[in-house]
Structures are given as structure tokens and as C-alpha cells.
Amino acid sequence: MAVQAVHIQGDAFLVCVTHSLSTEREEVMGLCIGEVDTQKVVHIHSVIILRRSDKRKDRVEISPEQLSAATTEADRLAEITGRPMRVVGWYHSHPHITVWPSHVDVRTQAMYQMMDVGFVGLIFSCFIEDKNTKTGRILYTCFQSVQAQKSSEYERIEVPLHVVPHNTIRKVCLESAVELPRILCQEEQDAYRRIHSLGHLDSITKIHNGSVFTKNLCGQMSAISGPLLQWLEDRLEQNQQRAQELQSEKEQLLQELKALG
């Protein structure tokens, strides 16, 4: 197996979970940016949320243009951090279904590994209810594909996934989180314009489609934009409070230093 383990930063993991919980009707996807060390351990530092051109309940696809754009973003991060950043994997959600990859997922993963043997796949299973406690659960897994011994098909191999705690939210992950509402809005606009451009629709149908479009945007504002804004405001308040505490500590230390002098 090419990869021994995967370490994902806590703030990047948070963006993946938030993106996965943004919709329970279709699967969502994104790309992982990071580096691979000499011990064949993949370190994921940030993620890129991808815009879906075709919404499907049980399938996601990454276009060559999106992969190229992600590579460009990885190069930009490499210049900023001075580390060899690249696209090291992909993630997608499994709403209401098992966390294990489907045959399509395994074949897709095998295709990516043909380009990079260190490429990994992450799956987030969400909107799953525990039958005993009646509480929601989020399950996640990391995998690669290998050729089956007595078959031409591929099979999955689970890769250990470790979430690395991170006390702060780095700028690159914060930008990805803030980008989520805009991407979801663009997806709704694309779907509405595609349907609205059909010439055979009557006036009542167009009015209905417009109402559905407005309803979906309001739902996104309530479920995504509102909580995200509240979270950012709470985070800002915490940072300001912490800054005041550090300033007070600094002044106290300066006074003690002055007394010693």
C-alpha cells in the first residue's frame, strides 16, 4: 500500500464536515491539499470546495478543469508556506447511506491513483440516526483502491485517518468555509437558469420554478449562511476577549520588569 496513514488538520476537517452537512439530498465533493512525507504519511492542510455542475443523489464527478484549478491553488499555497503542497486526495459525502465506498467510488479512486499513487479518498456519512439513542451521527473513513487478486476489479483498503487538533482556524480554511454559501448559491442559480432557458415552459411553470428557486435560497440562508455568520461573530468575540487578556498580561509583565529594574 502506497500510503501508511492520513493526518488531517482539525480546521480542514471542520470544513469537510460543514460542507457534507450542507445538503442531505445529493452528494457533495471537494479536493484535499497537503503534502506527503518520507514515511508515506499524507498531511492534509486545507480543502477546496467544488461546485457541482450536475447534482446527483448517489454520484459526484470532478472535472479536469476543477482539478487543474485545485493544482493552481496548491501551487499558490506552496509559495506562501514554502512547503511542497499539492492535491493529495478528494472527499465526498454519503447522505443517509453507509460510509463505505461504492463500486463507483472504488473505481474512481483507482483512476486517480493512476496519476498519483499517494492519492487518497475520504467519505463523510451524514444524516445517519442511531437507532438506540435517536441521535444523529457523522461517520468518516479514508481509503485507497487496489487490484483484486483473482479479479480485474478493484477493492478498497482502509487507510488510518487521524484528525490533528488545531486551536485556531487558519486563513486558508476560513476562506474555504466562507466560500461555501456562495458556491451553493451558484449551483442553485445554474439549475434555475438551465430550466428557465427551456422554450416550451408556460407562465405558470416559470412562476413555480421561480418560487422553488427563492425557497431554496432562503433555505440555504437559514441552514448555512445564518449559522456560519453567527459562528464567525462568536469567534471574533472570543478573539477580541483573548486579545484583551494578552494585553493585560503584557502590561502586568512590563510593570514587574520595571520594578525589577
From Swiss-Prot:
CDD domains: MPN_BRCC36. InterPro entries: BRCC36_C (IPR040749), JAMM/MPN+_dom (IPR000555), JAMM_MPN+_peptidase_M67A (IPR050242), MPN (IPR037518), MPN_BRCC36 (IPR033860). It is found in: Nucleus; Cytoplasm; Cytoplasm, Cytoskeleton, Spindle pole. It is an enzyme of class 3 (hydrolase). Belongs to the peptidase M67A family. BRCC36 subfamily. Gene3D superfamilies: Cytidine Deaminase, domain 2 (3.40.140.10). A motif (JAMM motif) lies at residues 92-105. This is Lys-63-specific deubiquitinase BRCC36. Signal peptide: none annotated. Metalloprotease that specifically cleaves 'Lys-63'-linked polyubiquitin chains. Does not have activity toward 'Lys-48'-linked polyubiquitin chains. Component of the BRCA1-A complex, a complex that specifically recognizes 'Lys-63'-linked ubiquitinated histones H2A and H2AX at DNA lesions sites, leading to target the brca1-bard1 heterodimer to sites of DNA damage at double-strand breaks (DSBs). In the BRCA1-A complex, it specifically removes 'Lys-63'-linked ubiquitin on histones H2A and H2AX, antagonizing the rnf8-dependent ubiquitination at double-strand breaks (DSBs). GO terms for molecular function: cysteine-type deubiquitinase activity; metal ion binding; metal-dependent deubiquitinase activity; metallopeptidase activity; polyubiquitin modification-dependent protein binding. Its EC number is 3.4.19.-.
